[in-house]
């Protein structure tokens, strides 16, 4: 059985900016001392004795606690989750240890260029988030009283959502009773913060030892996509970057321009972003971005073959059938929409959504993203800023609607 327990308790819900990283530290303390176990080690030993697994993660908006276990001990593991989440005994010794661990984790991210790009891109477009360096500086400010305050305010019954996947036959009533017994204050379901997004000039994060260009760019629309629209954009991403025969990645690989790049849709509560990222040699960058411009221009003009769409739909159908082979896969599918933007789309509706994909929707959405005028390019490299500016020029398109006319 796989269980995910989520609270809107991420970094954006910190009481004040000076303790921004507090949610991350709370997450690290999640499986520490509690009402029954005196230490993290004691809890861990009992939790994992039959092979069960647990983890936790933090984002701008969420803190999520996960577990997976053998079917025969699902109720024991759920009870241990209850103890960990509802009765933590925060202490200064574990706090100091986890503050050090969080700092080490974030410092390590400073050497992963893709980890530098996305927070910078968020900032560029108007999201109220700090950089990695700024996040690290907030860690020393976090005290035990801050941890307790954040936990009490955010870990409440109304602010909790859950996904449970596994053999639920004849167990739903018992699961409901167990969850209703959790001793959490009623609290409230927090609203997702809203940021007014805007266009941005390109940004270069200079690293003198980075001979390649690691890049990320996005177009954003200020609304949430519907499930059919998400599937249409997933189809387009597959056509552009999904395989070695795709229009952008496939051609780029064939011509020796790039080893790897990808594109994706990020559909959140208030907006949706069409994201691309990858790494390219400096001498190949302009040719790669010329190719990106060419292929997106073709999409905006409606130059998509029916057979390409059918091939992408066939691929998606296969991935659908492969995507429910484990309880974790099923749980992840629902978490992606339910926790992120409140969407609860039944998995067995997927074939119908795939069948409904059509060229008109794909072209309309691509045009909407491009003409939204909310766009940004972030790079990490040792190259001159002038080259980055040239790459950004290749991500500009005039009159997308007219191109598709």
Regions found by a protein language model. Name each.
Residues 10-15, 36, 62-63, 67-70:
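Active-site-adjacent loops and short helices of periplasmic peptidoglycan-processing enzymes
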Residues 1-7, 13, 159, 187-247, ...:
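His/Glu-based metal-binding/catalytic segments typifying zinc-dependent metallopeptidases
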Residues 21-34, 252:
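Active-site SXXK
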């Amino acid at each position: 059985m796989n269980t995910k327990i989520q609270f809107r308790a991420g970094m954006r819900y910190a009481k004040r900016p000076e303790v921004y990283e507090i949610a991350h530290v709370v997450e690290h303390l999640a499986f520490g001392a509690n009402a029954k176990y005196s230490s993290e080690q004691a809890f861990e030993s009992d939790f994992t004795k039959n092979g069960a697994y647990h983890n936790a993660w933090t984002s701008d908006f969420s803190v999520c606690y996960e577990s997976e276990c053998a079917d025969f001990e699902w109720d024991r593991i759920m009870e241990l989750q209850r103890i960990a989440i509802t009765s933590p005994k925060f202490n200064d010794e574990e706090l100091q240890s986890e503050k050090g661990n969080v700092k080490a984790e974030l410092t390590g991210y400073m050497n992963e260029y893709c980890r530098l790009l996305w927070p910078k891109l968020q900032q560029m477009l108007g999201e109220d988030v700090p950089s990695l360096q700024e996040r690290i500086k907030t860690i020393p400010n976090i005290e035990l009283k801050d941890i307790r305050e954040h936990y009490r305010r955010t870990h409440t019954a109304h602010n909790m959502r859950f996904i449970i996947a596994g053999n639920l036959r004849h167990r739903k009533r018992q699961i409901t009773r167990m969850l209703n017994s959790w001793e959490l204050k009623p609290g409230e379901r927090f609203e997702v913060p809203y940021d007014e997004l805007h266009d941005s000039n390109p940004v270069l994060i200079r690293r003198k030892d980075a001979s390649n260009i690691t890049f990320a760019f996005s177009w954003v629309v200020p609304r949430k996509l519907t499930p059919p629209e998400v599937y249409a954009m997933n189809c387009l991403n597959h056509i552009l970057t999904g395989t070695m025969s795709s229009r952008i990645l496939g051609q780029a690989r064939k011509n020796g321009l790039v080893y790897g790049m990808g594109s994706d849709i990020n559909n959140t509560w208030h907006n949706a972003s069409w994201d691309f990222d990858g790494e390219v040699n400096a001498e190949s960058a302009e040719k790669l971005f010329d190719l990106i411009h060419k292929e997106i221009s073709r999409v905006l003009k409606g130059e998509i073959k029916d057979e390409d769409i059918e091939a992408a739909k066939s691929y998606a159908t296969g991935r659908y059938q492969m995507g429910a082979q484990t309880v974790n896969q099923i749980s992840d599918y629902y978490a992606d929409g339910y926790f992120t933007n409140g969407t609860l789309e039944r998995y067995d509706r997927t074939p119908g959504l795939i069948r409904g994909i059509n060229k008109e929707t794909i072209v309309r959405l691509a045009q909407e993203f491009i003409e939204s005028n909310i766009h940004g390019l972030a790079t990490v490299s040792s190259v001159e800023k002038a080259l980055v500016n040239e790459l950004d020029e290749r991500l500009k398109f005039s009159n997308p609607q007219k191109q598709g006319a």
